[in-house]
Amino acid sequence: MSARARIGVDTDRPTHQADGRPVVRILGTHGVPANYGGFETAAEKVGLHLLEAGWRVIVYCQVAGSGEITYDEWRGLERVNVPVNLPGWRGTSLFDLKCIMHSSQFADLCLVFGYNTGIFNTWQRFKRIPMVINMDGIEWSRARWGFFRQMILYINERFSAAVGNHLIADHPEIEKYLWSRAPKRKVTMIAYGADEVLEADEAPVRALGLEPGRYLTLICRPIPENSILELVQGFSSRPRDFKLVLLGKYDPATDDYHRQVVEAASDDVVFLGAIFDPEVVQPLRFHSAMYLHGHTVGGTNPSLVEALGAGNPVLAHDNMYNRWTAGTGQAYFTTAADVASALDAILGSPERLAKMSADARKRYHAGLSWQQIGEQYRLLLDRYLPAKVTKTETGRH
């Protein structure tokens, strides 16, 4: 084992633009490569964009177990592997704390995804380390967390809003909300991105017993706020010449909401379970006749943007978040009856499906590609490199 791998500080590597490159440390995700969710994908895509632009990018990665911090690289991104041997939110909190303490040994700019442990970021503020924080959605308001977790999130949100040099909102409505937490000059809206999918192998789709173009997809966490029951009820209200494919872990034996969804499903509803392999998920999206999106809360949802990037016609829950993301060319619902009538009208019209698909790609190209999103991050982060953050500016923010 190298000396660098045995110690907790990568002292043999240049930092703080010592080699002429701007430096950013990415915290708040499980790390790269992305294997979990939206924040991990954002960290990976933004990190790679910055790397191509000539930056040195250091990503903190959570690994199971105990021992010393180790270092390696993935596709040119430098990884700081932080071992944690606690499960769930306790492990995540410990991981965040370790990352903050490690990164605080340097003067490098930090890009932080999320505010779940925002109170810990006060240490970075004390050390006068510049921080740009992606504030996610209004997580504390989500009923799924319960009162105790909501209060923890609320407190951490307030701390992050106060100590961050700059805040990123991933949706205009989140941006407006953050204006109540920080000066407008301190908030920038940068949406979530996706890769465009122009072709995909049919084999993974057929291997699942599905016919390309003859099924709809619904990909989300199976919880009530994602309107799965309404979508399944609306689809199942009458026979259709399509399948409805659900991705996600459903356990009707132990979860009452899951049981309701399964009981409402017709024989044309297919439960595939939780699938994370992009070599399967991407073809499933691309060859889907339509994407159903029931999210009622949050900002720019990754699954919705990915559907637009695949050219999927979209039927989404009617709210301000989804309407901004998907645009005027898609369809919206509020009730199960709305779902049924919308599917009746759309699935029977190849012309409308084609128009919605074209509108989805048009919306994607209007500002949702990772190239566009990555460049917006670069321009913002460049303003907060340590050499450009004066004492006056740091104090003001």
Q: Where do the PLM segments sit?
A:
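Conserved donor-binding/catalytic core segment of Leloir-type glycosyltransferases
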Residues: V24-L27, A207-P239, V245
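Aromatic "clamp/platform" in nucleotide-sugar-dependent glycosyltransferases that forms part
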Residues: H295-T296
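Short hydrophobic beta-strand element within catalytic cores of glycosyltransferases
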Residues: M290, G309, P313-A316
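An aromatic- and histidine-rich active-site surface loop
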Residues: G67, T92-D136, W140, G299
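Membrane-proximal helix-turn-helix segments that form the acceptor-binding/catalytic region
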Residues: M101-S104, Q150-L167
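A charged, aromatic-enriched C-terminal amphipathic alpha-helix characteristic of glycosyltransferases
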Residues: A53, E351-P386
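Nucleotide-activated donor-binding/catalytic signature segment of Leloir-type glycosyltransferases, i.e.
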Residues: H258-E279
